[in-house]
């Protein structure tokens, strides 16, 4: 055999061996893509927080008038498992929350299901759900005016999973050719009384809500409705559309009928105002060539307090605290605390807000490192919160976050009268 023939034979054998190895190495395993009968995931979280208290703030005075402090430390351990059991077309889904918090003043624990519901899907276009479900209505990142049947987000941590409500819900989806590509209808029934969904609203009612989703000319549109019952009747819509591959615009609008607001004068005289209210949101999301993500939103809260109403409440708290110091009588402070729980002390109780979040992916080529900055401003009184944070996920199934929250504002402003002036937080999560 000549050298040429030997080389040709060797090349042929090598090619056959390589082909056989490739066929063996890249064999498609369909079982790897089959749905498992049971799935389990979640995370364990350790969180340490340090609070610098705002001793001149109205909310601080309500909570610490008889126990003055300058700082608080809080350690929290959280276990959040989630899973799914499948049996044919049915499944049982859950997301639990087990939490223990050790604070300077004592310990608090909580154990609950954020979600626990059965689901039946006999057809890809039909789903029936029953149980405790956490819905996500609305396109806004920090706020959702049309989130009629869900709990309010924390704008400082809007991606945190929320607790759901117990309900019966369905989902019907149909796809088409043409400008209208998808239609989805989601009706639901949400009972509320002293025993079930007791914090959804007032009275004992069977509430009916629905959402209609349309994908029309590459624009996502939702029409939402909630019947009159535990909460007053409300309806609205949202939309989202990509203006470019790296630029998205979104918005929401909601109309709430016969809303009630309790407002107080500086002397403590409380009145209830009634009337319809409109809330809306408009936002942009932009991704730059440097992998920097910008989220900008404007939110108008039609149910919120005016600047004057907030200042009257602050003056009432100051007067109540002065009476307590002079007489030891805390009756006015107790009344002010009830008003705070009803609206004044809730997150973002004002009328007009701006939200900006800037996130930079892996700056200076530091892998798995993501710094971010969040700013929330009350545009009526000029007070703001500024939240810088650092996120690192370079270890397998592990995430570390360090962030600080700084509140700025003068006397009588929303963030200037809060319980804290700053907060430092370290969080570690182990996912499984």
What do these predicted regions represent?
Residues 71, 103-109, 160-162, 196-206, ...:
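Solvent-exposed loop/turn segments connecting transmembrane beta-strands
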Residues 76-190, 214, 409:
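Outer membrane beta-barrel
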Residues 46-52, 85-89, 98-102, 134-136, ...:
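Transmembrane beta-strands of outer-membrane beta-barrel pores
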Residues 170, 354-358, 418-432:
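Outer-membrane beta-barrel "beta-signal"
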Residues 42-44, 94-96, 130, 170, ...:
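Membrane-embedded beta-strand positions of outer-membrane beta-barrel proteins
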Residues 88-94, 125-128, 177-183, 216-223, ...:
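Repeated loop/turn-to-beta-strand initiation elements of outer-membrane beta-barrel proteins
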Residues 22-128, 390, 399-403, 421-427, ...:
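Beta-barrel outer-membrane channel/assembly domains of diderm bacteria
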């Amino acid at each position: 055999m000549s050298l040429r023939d030997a080389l040709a034979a060797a090349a042929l054998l090598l090619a056959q061996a390589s082909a056989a190895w490739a066929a063996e190495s890249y064999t498609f395993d369909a079982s790897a893509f089959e749905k498992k009968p049971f799935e389990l995931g979640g995370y364990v979280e350790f969180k340490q927080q340090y609070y610098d208290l705002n001793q001149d703030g109205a909310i601080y005075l309500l909570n610490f008038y008889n126990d003055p402090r300058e700082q608080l430390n809080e350690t929290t351990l959280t276990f959040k498992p989630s899973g799914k059991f499948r049996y044919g077309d049915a499944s049982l889904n859950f997301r639990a929350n087990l939490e223990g918090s050790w604070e300077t003043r004592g310990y608090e624990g909580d154990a609950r299901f954020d979600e626990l519901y059965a689901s039946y899907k006999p057809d890809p276009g039909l789903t029936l759900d029953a149980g405790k479900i956490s819905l996500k209505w609305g396109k806004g990142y920090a706020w959702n005016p049309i989130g009629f049947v869900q709990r309010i987000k924390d704008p400082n941590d809007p991606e945190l999973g929320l607790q759901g409500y117990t309900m019966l819900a369905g989902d019907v989806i149909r796809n088409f050719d043409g400008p209208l590509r998808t239609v989805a209808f989601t009706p639901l029934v949400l009972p509320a009384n002293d025993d079930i969904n007791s914090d959804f609203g007032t009275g004992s009612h069977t509430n009916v809500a629905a959402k209609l989703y349309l994908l029309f000319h590459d624009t996502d549109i939702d029409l939402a409705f909630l019947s009159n019952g535990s909460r007053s009747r409300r309806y609205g819509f949202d939309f989202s559309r990509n203006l470019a591959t790296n630029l998205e615009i979104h918005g929401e609008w909601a109309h709430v009928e016969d809303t009630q607001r309790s407002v107080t004068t500086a002397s403590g005289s409380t009145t209830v105002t009634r009337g319809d209210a409109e809330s809306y949101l408009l936002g942009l999301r932009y991704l730059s060539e440097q992998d920097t993500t910008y989220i900008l939103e404007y939110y108008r809260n039609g149910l919120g307090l005016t600047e004057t109403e907030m200042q009257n409440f602050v003056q009432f708290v100051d007067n109540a605290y002065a009476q307590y110091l002079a007489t030891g009588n805390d009756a006015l402070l107790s009344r002010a605390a009830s008003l705070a729980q009803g609206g004044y002390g809730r997150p973002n109780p004002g009328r007009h807000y701006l939200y900006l979040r800037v996130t930079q992916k892996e700056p200076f080529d530091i892998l798995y490192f993501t710094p971010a900055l969040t700013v929330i401003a009350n545009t009526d009184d000029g007070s703001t919160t500024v939240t810088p944070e650092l996120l690192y996920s370079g270890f397998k199934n592990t995430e570390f976050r360090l962030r600080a929250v700084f509140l700025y504002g003068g006397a009588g402003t929303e963030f200037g009268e809060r319980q804290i002036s700053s907060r430092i937080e370290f969080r570690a999560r182990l996912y499984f």
